[in-house]
């Protein structure tokens, strides 16, 4: 049989590459590839996925609907996606030493929403790190679901050390009687004491949940304490330090399995994104390799090198300091409260040099969040490109020199140094542009 001319035309269009189907979007995809290749990505929540993950996310798995869980789907034709999801779950269990894993959450925020639904009831009190002290919007921000559907209370950092202090958490827990205490953060440069937080939760009869989205890669590499032995539930994204696809997953004790499964599906989501779950499976495998541990070590080393440069006298002279005086993780928090430069200006200055970061509030910030008094600078993506101590020293000096000089910085000269680093460490060199 022969297709009609119109049907044949439709078939030809179906099989056409994007440069023919939609040149406008194709051009923008090429532009974004160029932006990532030619600059230095230092947003702490960003990273680059392996080529294998890109292949998963652009695969035929994007066509497959698979509501339910392996062996218990509401659709036929799931024999292969069942295997993929099972592999992802088992790899994550082994990697993190967890009794239960759910790899279906579309994002970290959706994973967190499922945790709330499983562990507490609407109106219950929850206690998390204040957003302007380094917490995440899903930890109780008033206009987020977590602050609208639950009675959200907050603990802050110690006003002298700017560190999370278990005694402050304990006092707030005794005052507020939370049903759940939340650990984890979005913009905090130190390691939390999960054991102490668990003891506080037990003292007040609260569940203990840790959102390890930012430091999951460090935990997987054995370079950061794991919250899994202490928390009732642990949630995470699969990108950030972990370097996988933009998505989420949940780890927990087996006793919460049924509630969490129901909270994810059908409580929060319908069909899972199987092309993304395949990418997560690949990422869990990668995270168990010596090469991954080396990358995480270089990530930590780079952050310490950056912090040390930003503590130098020329930077201090511009009223700039490093929050907590250093870092234990993949990011550095720059404090601009005493500088004439605000966070927006600092972000724009480094962007002009070819370095992408983000402005961020700091504790006791006198400026509005739209401009903020802080910069959050991460080192994960540079480690993925292959940076070592020498390269981190160079990029740290570029950032330090720019911030010390402020508006009088020689942006052209600094940009040339960034260009050289980007050229020396090519990103996706075998990935062809679409055009």
UniProtKB/Swiss-Prot annotation:
Classification via HAMAP family: SHMT (MF_00051)
Pathway assigned in UniProt: One-carbon metabolism; tetrahydrofolate interconversion; Amino-acid biosynthesis; glycine biosynthesis; glycine from L-serine: step 1/1
Superkingdom, taxonomy of origin: Bacteria
Assembly: Homodimer.
Record-linked PANTHER family: SERINE HYDROXYMETHYLTRANSFERASE (PTHR11680), SERINE HYDROXYMETHYLTRANSFERASE 1 (PTHR11680:SF35)
Keyword list, A-Z: Amino-acid biosynthesis, Cytoplasm, One-carbon metabolism, Pyridoxal phosphate, Transferase
GO molecular function: glycine hydroxymethyltransferase activity; pyridoxal phosphate binding
Organism whose genome encodes this protein: Bifidobacterium longum subsp. infantis (strain ATCC 15697 / DSM 20088 / JCM 1222 / NCTC 11817 / S12)
Protein task: Catalyzes the reversible interconversion of serine and glycine with tetrahydrofolate (THF) serving as the one-carbon carrier. This reaction serves as the major source of one-carbon groups required for the biosynthesis of purines, thymidylate, methionine, and other important biomolecules. Also exhibits THF-independent aldolase activity toward beta-hydroxyamino acids, producing glycine and aldehydes, via a retro-aldol mechanism.
This protein's name: Serine hydroxymethyltransferase
GO CC entries: cytosol
Record EC number: 2.1.2.1
């Amino acid at each position: 049989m022969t297709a009609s001319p119109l049907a044949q035309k439709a078939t030809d269009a179906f099989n056409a590459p994007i440069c023919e189907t939609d040149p406008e979007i194709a051009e923008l995809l090429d532009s974004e590839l160029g932006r990532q290749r030619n600059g230095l990505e230092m947003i702490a929540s960003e990273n680059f996925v392996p080529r294998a993950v890109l292949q998963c996310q652009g695969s035929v798995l994007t066509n497959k609907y698979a509501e339910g869980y392996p062996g218990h789907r509401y659709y036929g034709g799931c024999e292969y996606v069942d295997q993929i999801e099972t592999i992802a779950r088992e790899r994550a269990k082994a990697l993190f030493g967890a009794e239960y894993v759910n790899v279906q959450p579309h994002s970290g925020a959706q994973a967190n929403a499922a945790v709330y639904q499983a562990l507490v009831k609407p109106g219950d009190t929850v206690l998390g790190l204040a957003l302007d002290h380094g917490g995440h919007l899903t930890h109780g921000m008033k206009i987020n679901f977590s602050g609208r559907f639950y009675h959200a209370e907050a603990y802050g950092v110690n006003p002298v050390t700017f560190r999370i202090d278990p005694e402050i958490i304990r006092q707030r827990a005794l005052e507020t009687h939370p049903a759940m205490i939340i650990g984890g953060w979005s913009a905090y440069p130190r390691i939390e004491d999960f054991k102490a937080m668990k003891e506080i939760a037990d003292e007040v009869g609260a569940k203990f949940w840790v959102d390890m989205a930012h430091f999951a890669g460090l935990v997987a590499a054995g370079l950061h304490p794991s919250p899994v032995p202490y928390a009732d539930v642990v949630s995470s994204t699969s990108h950030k330090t972990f370097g996988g696809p933009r998505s989420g997953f949940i780890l927990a004790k087996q006793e919460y399995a049924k509630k969490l499964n129901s909270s994810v599906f059908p409580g929060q989501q319908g069909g899972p994104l199987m092309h993304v779950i395949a990418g997560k499976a690949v990422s869990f495998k990668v995270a168990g390799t010596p090469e991954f541990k080396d990358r995480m070590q270089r990530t930590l080393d780079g952050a310490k090198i950056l912090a040390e440069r930003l503590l130098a006298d020329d930077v201090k002279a511009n009223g700039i300091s490093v929050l907590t005086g250093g870092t234990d993780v993949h990011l550095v928090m720059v404090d601009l409260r005493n500088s004439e430069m605000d966070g927006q200006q600092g972000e724009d200055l480094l962007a002009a040099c070819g370095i992408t970061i983000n402005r961020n509030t700091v504790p006791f910030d006198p400026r509005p969040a739209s401009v903020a008094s802080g910069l959050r600078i991460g080192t994960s993506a540079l480690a993925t490109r292959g940076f070592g101590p020498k390269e981190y020293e160079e990029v740290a000096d570029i950032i330090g020199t720019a911030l010390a000089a402020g508006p009088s910085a020689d942006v052209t000269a600094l940009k040339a140094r960034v260009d050289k680093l980007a050229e020396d460490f090519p990103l996706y060199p075998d990935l062809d542009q679409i055009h």
